[in-house]
Amino acid sequence: MSRLAVELPGLSMKNPIMPASGCFGFGKEFAGFYDLNHLGAIAIKATTVEPRFGNPTPRVAETHSGMLNAIGLQNPGLNNVIDNELARLADVDVPIVANIAGSTVNDYVEVAEAISRVDNVHALELNISCPNVKEGGIAFGTVPDVAAQLTQEVKRVSTVPVYVKLSPNVSDIVEMAQAVERAGADGLSMINTLLGMRLDLKRRTPILANGTGGLSGPAIKPVAIRMIYQVSQAVSIPIIGMGGIQSADDVLEFMLAGADAVAVGTANFTDPYVCPTIIDELPKRMDELGIERIADIVGGSWKQS
C-alpha cells in the first residue's frame, strides 16, 4: 500500500485528497487542467430531485482570507446528473462521492435511492445544511433528532456508505456528530460553511442578493481544526475534514486533529491545480517531519496526550 493511501468506508483512496463538493462542479470542468485519476476521490456538486437554478445574483462576495457564497444548490437535477454528469466520469478510476440535498426527507430518500445505485458512485455525502420546509425552514443540520431521522431514512435506502456533512452553525457539534453516528452514519464530513454577511457601504444593503451566505476559505480553518479535534475524540466513525485547506501542511494539520481524509474547497477557485500540487508536495513534507505512512498520524494530536 502506498504511504499516502487511506481506507474509508466505500472509499479506497490512493491519497487522502479530494476536491470538496460545490468547488469542483461535476469534475469535467477540471479535467482540462490535470488527470483526475491523480486524486484520491471526487465529491461532485450537490444533486436534488428536480433541477435548481440557484439564488439570484450576486451570489459570491470576497472576504479577507475567504469568500461568501449563496449559490442555492444550482444543479441540473437527479436524472441529468445520472445520465450525463456521472456518465462522463465513468472512465475515471477514482471513487466518486455523490453529495445529495433536498427540502424534505422524501427528497433526500428519492435522490439517495437512485444515485447510490449508479455503478461509479462509491459513497453519499448528506448535505444537512438545507432548510427543512416541513419544519418552518429550520436547517436539518441544526437539530440532532431531525438530523438523525434524516440519516436513518437515507441509510435505509442507500446501497453505499453515507457520510453526513456537518454544519458548524450549531451550539454543540459533538452532540450532532454523535446523533448521526447513532442513526447509522458511516462517516462524517466537516465542516460546512459558517454563516456570514457583507454590506455594500454605498447602497447600505447586503452584497449578496440572498443577504447571508456561507463563509469558506482559510478564515474558517481554525474553527474546522477545533471542531474536528473535538468530534474525532467523541465518535468512532471516520471524518473527511475540510475548511480552508490550501497546502500539504494544512492537510497534515487536519489529519493530526483527527481527520482520516480531507477535501479541498475554495482554493480550487484561486488555483485549479491546488489538489495535484498538494498531493505531490505531501511525500516531501512527510519525509521532513519523519512521517512514514500518512494514515498513522490521524488523531496524533490527542492520541499521544
Curated annotation (Swiss-Prot):
Pfam families associated with the record: DHO_dh
EC number(s) from the headed UniProt entry: 1.3.1.14
The protein's required cofactors = FMN
Keyword NAD annotated: yes
Q: Where does substrate bind?
A: 45, 69-73, 127, 192-193
Task: Reply yes or no: does the keyword Oxidoreductase apply.
Answer: yes
Which pathway does this chain act in? Pyrimidine metabolism; UMP biosynthesis via de novo pathway; orotate from (S)-dihydroorotate (NAD(+) route): step 1/1
Protein's cellular compartments = Cytoplasm
Annotated PROSITE patterns? DHODEHASE_1, DHODEHASE_2
GO CC terms, sorted: cytoplasm
Molecular functions (GO terms): dihydroorotate dehydrogenase (NAD+) activity
Q: Which residues bind FMN?
A: 21, 45-46, 99, 127, 165, 191, 217, 243-244, 265-266
Query: Mind listing the GO biological process terms from this record?
Result: 'de novo' pyrimidine nucleobase biosynthetic process; 'de novo' UMP biosynthetic process
Q: What class of enzyme is it?
A: oxidoreductase
Which InterPro entries does the annotation name? Aldolase_TIM, DHO_dehydrogenase, DHOD_1B, Dihydroorotate_DH_1, Dihydroorotate_DH_1_2, Dihydroorotate_DH_cat, Dihydroorotate_DH_CS, Dihydroorotate_DH_I
**Cofactor comment in the record?**
Binds 1 FMN per subunit.
Q: Which reaction does it catalyse?
A: (S)-dihydroorotate + NAD(+) = orotate + NADH + H(+)
Active site annotated at which positions?
130 (nucleophile)
Keyword terms, alphabetized? Cytoplasm, Flavoprotein, FMN, NAD, Oxidoreductase, Pyrimidine biosynthesis
- Domain of life from the UniProt record: Bacteria
Family recorded in the similarity comment = Belongs to the dihydroorotate dehydrogenase family. Type 1 subfamily.
**HAMAP family, per the entry:** DHO_dh_type1
Its quaternary organisation is: Heterotetramer of 2 PyrK and 2 PyrD type B subunits.
What does this gene product do? Catalyzes the conversion of dihydroorotate to orotate with NAD(+) as electron acceptor.
Q: What's the protein called, per UniProt? A: Dihydroorotate dehydrogenase B (NAD(+)), catalytic subunit
Q: Which organism is it from?
A: Halalkalibacterium halodurans (strain ATCC BAA-125 / DSM 18197 / FERM 7344 / JCM 9153 / C-125) (Bacillus halodurans)
**Lineage, please?**
Bacteria, Bacillati, Bacillota, Bacilli, Bacillales
Gene from which the chain derives: pyrD
